[in-house]
Structures are given as structure tokens and as C-alpha cells.
From Swiss-Prot:
Principal subcellular localisation of the protein: cytoplasm
Organism of this sequence: Methylococcus capsulatus (strain ATCC 33009 / NCIMB 11132 / Bath)
Name the UniProt record assigns to this protein: Acetylglutamate kinase
Key words of the record: Amino-acid biosynthesis, Arginine biosynthesis, ATP-binding, Cytoplasm, Kinase, Nucleotide-binding, Transferase
GO terms for biological process, alphabetical: arginine biosynthetic process via ornithine; L-arginine biosynthetic process
Pathway: Amino-acid biosynthesis; L-arginine biosynthesis; N(2)-acetyl-L-ornithine from L-glutamate: step 2/4
A Pfam family recorded for this sequence: AA_kinase
Family: Belongs to the acetylglutamate kinase family. ArgB subfamily.
Gene coding for it: argB
Length: 300
């Protein structure tokens, strides 16, 4: 009879420690909703994609309700380039004419969304892909941007770029209650019936607020919020975040992410996390370990 080789004691002890450390967090979050904004390198690297899918499935299996909102900017840019269409950006936002919006819907609502659904389902989950147009989930409002000039501001038409006007969570609630994992593409529909591309961070934040989520998790390509010395700031209050924005410590592309998280907290979400999606099993490490791996934001 072939005998199984015994696990090395130190390795077995580490496994036991990880499981016991996770137990109180699993107990605390059971039955709660956690909204995860999925983007950055975690969507590009094959190993990280599978790691993320396993994390989401595990959350569901232990009784937590994950809701995934995803981006897809690089994928949109790649397809536009292949089609010979140049992307124009104004203050970080892609100018989106009707033809570009067709590509955005094709990439976000089709290619990217269905790839994520397939990844989760292959890991044993039951994911269902949605865009904000399904079940009238996301109502959008066209963004109108002004650019300061010497005399009067210039009004810039970004085309089919929107913000969240309202969210009707009925279809998401139905899926969660049916033990499915919703995967949402950030496309909304306006009062004019047109489709609008919406920043995925904003959609995730509003979704967390409307669903009365326990947590909002934003996956990024950085460790989290960094101090002036480059060290990770592991925990911040809203007041502390305001001060860091004011003194320039938080700057650039991190500001809209942080503001989105702050709005979610003010809207009733218990905590928000900005974490490094380049780390294997980042979601589990942030949720189920005492130390975490990113920046935890709290209302206090």
C-alpha cells in the first residue's frame, strides 16, 4: 500500500495558523455583501486572474456575498488601436463618440465581462454577467466638463461619458439571494436611451452604498495609500484622508479612488479598502488576516 508523505510540521502549522486566523473574520462577515472593484494588473496577468476568481468563489462558499464591478480601459484601448481609431483623453477621461461607445460596450459588456464570468465559473462559482443596462440597473447622467481659459471656461463634450444618476439594485439582489455572483460592467443608460461609459470605481462605490455593503474593496496597481516617505498607510479616517489630500500627500489618480471610497463610507458602507491587486490572493489577505495588505478607510 502506498503511504502518503507526511506534511512537514512547520508547513502544516502555517496552514493551521492561516485557517484559524481567518475564522473570526469569516464568522463576522457571513451573510454580508462585499463589493469588489476589479481592475489593473489583476485583470491582465493570467495567474492573478485565476487567483482573483478563486478568492471570489471562496468568499461565496463561506457565506459572504461578493459583487464584482470591473473596469477594462486597457482592453478598450487595445481594440480601438487595432481598429485604427485614436483615443483622446481629457483630464484622464476618454472622449467617447458613438462609434467608440460601440467598442466600449463590446469590450466591457462582452469580452471582459464574459471572461471574468467564465474564470469564476471554472473555479466552481456561479457567476452571472451584467451591464448597467440589464434590469435598468444603472441610470447614467452625461458628464459635462469645463476647461478653464483666460476669460471664460470652455465647455468640453466628452460624448458618451457619464456618471451614476441612480442604481436600482433589484436584479443584483435577486442574483445574490439566488446564490449567484454578480459581475457588473460599468455601462449605464441615460434618460435619452443612450449608453454611457462610467468610471468603474464610481460604479463600485455607489453599488456598495445602495446594496448597504459591509465593505468596498478597490484593487489597484499600488500598495494602497502611501505617506510622503513612501511607506504604506494601513489605516485612515475620513478626516485624515482630507488632510492628506489637502497637503498633497494623496495626489493624481489616487484622488478619485479615495473620494469614491469616502463617498461610500458617508453613504453607510462600514469600511473601504484600497489594496494591491498585483499580490496573489490580495482579497483574501486583506479580509482574513489580522494585518491586511493595503489601506483600510473608516468613517471615524
Amino acid at each position: 500500500m502506498k503511504q502518503q508523505e507526511p506534511l512537514e510540521t512547520s508547513f502544516a502549522n502555517r496552514i493551521a495558523h492561516v485557517l484559524t486566523e481567518a475564522l473570526p473574520y469569516i464568522r463576522r462577515f457571513k451573510g454580508r455583501t462585499i463589493v469588489v472593484k476589479y481592475g489593473g494588473n489583476a485583470m491582465i496577468d493570467d495567474h492573478l486572474k485565476n487567483s482573483f476568481a478563486r478568492d471570489v468563489v471562496l468568499l461565496k462558499l463561506v457565506g459572504i456575498n461578493p459583487v464584482v464591478v470591473h473596469g477594462g480601459g486597457p482592453q478598450i484601448g487595445n481594440l480601438l488601436q487595432r481598429l485604427g481609431k485614436t483615443s483622446e483623453f481629457v483630464q484622464g477621461m476618454r472622449v467617447t463618440d458613438a462609434e467608440t461607445m460601440d467598442v466600449v460596450e463590446m469590450v466591457l459588456g462582452g469580452l471582459v465581462n464574459k471572461e471574468i464570468v467564465n474564470l469564476i465559473n471554472r473555479q466552481g462559482g456561479a457567476a452571472v454577467g451584467l451591464s448597467g443596462k440589464d434590469g435598468d440597473l444603472i441610470r447614467a447622467r452625461k458628464i459635462r466638463m469645463s476647461q478653464p481659459l483666460s476669460d471664460a471656461p470652455e465647455i468640453i463634450d466628452l460624448g458618451h461619458v457619464g456618471e451614476v444618476a441612480s442604481i436600482d439594485p433589484a436584479v443584483v439582489d435577486m442574483l445574490v439571494n439566488g446564490d449567484f455572483i454578480p459581475v457588473i460592467a460599468p455601462i449605464g443608460v441615460g434618460e435619452d436611451g443612450c449608453s454611457y461609459n462610467i468610471n468603474a470605481d464610481l460604479v463600485a462605490g455607489k453599488m456598495a452604498e445602495v446594496l448597504k455593503a459591509e465593505k468596498l474593496i478597490l484593487l489597484t496597481n499600488t500598495q494602497g495609500i502611501l505617506g510622503r516617505d513612501g511607506a504604506l498607510l494601513t489605516g485612515l479616517s475620513l478626516k485624515e484622508v482630507d488632510a492628506l489630500i489637502e497637503d498633497g500627500t494623496i495626489s493624481g489618480g489616487m484622488i478619485p479612488k479615495v473620494r469614491c471610497a469616502m463617498d461610500a463610507l458617508r453613504g453607510g458602507v462600514n469600511s473601504a479598502h484600497i489594496i494591491d491587486g498585483r499580490i496573489d490572493h490580495a482579497v483574501l489577505l486583506e479580509l482574513f488576516t489580522d494585518q491586511g495588505i493595503g489601506t483600510l478607510l473608516l468613517r471615524r
